[in-house]
Amino acid sequence: MALDIHAHRILILDFGSQYTQLIARRVREIGVYCELHPFDMDDEAIREFAPKGVILAGGPESVHEANSPRCPQAVFDLGVPVFGICYGMQTMAEQLGGKVAGSELREFGYARVDVVGKSRLLDGIEDHIDADGLFGLDVWMSHGDKVTKLPEDFHILASTPSCPIAGMADDARGYYGVQFHPEVTHTKQGGRILSRFILDICGCEALWTPSKIAEDAIAQVRAQVGTDSVLLGLSGGVDSSVVAALLHKAIGDQLTCVFVDNGLLRLHEGEQVMAMFAENMGVKVIRANAEEQFLNNLEGESDPEKKRKIIGRTFIDVFDAESCKLDNIKYLAQGTIYPDVIESAGAKSGKAHVIKSHHNVGGLPEEMNLKLVEPLRELFKDEVRRLGLELGLPYDMVYRHPFPGPGLGVRILGEVKKEYADILRRADHIFIEELRKADWYHKVSQAFVVFQPVKSVGVVGDGRRYAWVVALRAVETIDFMTARWAHLPYELLETVSGRIINEIEGISRVTYDVSSKPPATIEWE
């Protein structure tokens, strides 16, 4: 009998915290499957999910205000351990008979909590031991309210000077609450705390590993598809590449990929995609060379949103034309990942997930009367990358920097022309090449060059050059929601600038973007 890697599972209820997806990623890293659902999840759905434990996440609301979110009673009726984090601790306390009030001194940022009570959750976990033998933890706080009265059968677990009940525990029922955030890296022992709750208190087994995920996904694809044929739009990005590798391993020649070359790809990208999948892996890949069609459709358009729509619409036209040449296609594969599922569920719906269509294929499944195959829909991006390595894809492909769906079309400011794309491709290649040489490529989260449709005077030898300006962009980020510009060494920037200006005739000036997000976005358009 096949191993059920979903058998040991954790339910995470979302009360609106910016960290909720991070909790889910941390649970998965421990090796346990989990799902994230809105706080008002239906009672019957909770019982059907049958978790071995529940985590109540944080949120921006105040428990003592009218109509603030509450945890479904079904959670406390399950008879499984429950872990409340920040707002989750507060609503647990209030619902079980305790009290919560606004705090005169709010806590945001780093803090030290003293572990003042014995519990299965924190015993043996500490950052400091003071002269009196008191254990301390370095944590991340983000709260304006606090628990002022414990529910019956709870005892104080941790405290700070301004928050005497910074943690609470009822070991008999396996109920715990902490006012800090164990899911963020700022809480040094956060991983150990979550692991203690999930593995020791909930009794979960670490079944969720890349090798087992690959085996399970392959088995599911074979069961769903049978002997039918599957079509995949292969872009060369991480998600579609991992889907291609997974499907090829699962169903072999039943998979056909269409790779649309829109003329807006990185230098040699088309050749690299074909070499990797068609030549090395033996995947059936149709390369549609549509550069002229894309550039003709983009002619004269400078509005960023309109450019995106033109590129998306043209992709569908080309993809549709190629797919119509194929016989007996029954399934369309997409690289939908778990954050897409979460975002598409709708705010606090508590209903079944509605999967977001991939930005490239739009309404194609309905138009072509195809059924969907989405083998990555349970996975976060970091899990997709690890799965890619498990399937044998090269590290440099799996951990390549993000590239926008419209490609260079949104890195060329204003109208898109072949001349601009050719110049930008070469400049971008030089930047990435030098980052790799200097061992900076994997130290930054994303790096690229932007073409600016303005000219600047330069001097080359004894002559005057009037040519284009490009900007280098490199950022560091954890979640791409916020980002800081990367402080690259001046010597590296000098090397990149010198090479670009000397090797590319159409460029006379190179600038470096030192804007962080917010207020700027990572991409320029």
Curated annotation (Swiss-Prot):
Keyword Nucleotide-binding: yes
GO CC aspect terms: cytosol
Annotated S-S bridges: none
Domain Glutamine amidotransferase type-1: 9-207
GO molecular function, one term: ATP binding
SUPFAM superfamilies from the UniProt entry: Adenine nucleotide alpha hydrolases-like, Class I glutamine amidotransferase-like, GMP synthetase C-terminal dimerisation domain
Pfam family, one: GMP_synt_C
Superkingdom of the organism of origin: Bacteria
Binding of ATP, residues: S235, G236, G237, V238, D239, S240, S241
Enzyme class name: ligase
Pathway: Purine metabolism; GMP biosynthesis; GMP from XMP (L-Gln route): step 1/1
UniProt keyword annotations, A-Z: ATP-binding, Glutamine amidotransferase, GMP biosynthesis, Ligase, Nucleotide-binding, Purine biosynthesis
EC code: 6.3.5.2
Alphabetized CDD domains for the sequence: GATase1_GMP_Synthase (cd01742), GMP_synthase_C (cd01997)
Annotated catalysed reactions: XMP + L-glutamine + ATP + H2O = GMP + L-glutamate + AMP + diphosphate + 2 H(+)
Active site, UniProt feature: C86 (nucleophile), H181, E183
Domain GMPS ATP-PPase, first and last residues per copy: 208-400
PANTHER family from the UniProt entry: GMP SYNTHASE [GLUTAMINE-HYDROLYZING] (PTHR11922:SF2), GMP SYNTHASE-RELATED (PTHR11922)
Function: Catalyzes the synthesis of GMP from XMP.
Subunit relationships: Homodimer.
NCBIfam families with a match to the protein in the record: guaA_Cterm, guaA_Nterm, PRK00074.1
Protein name: GMP synthase [glutamine-hydrolyzing]
Lineage start: Bacteria, Pseudomonadati, Pseudomonadota, Gammaproteobacteria, Pseudomonadales
Underlying gene: guaA
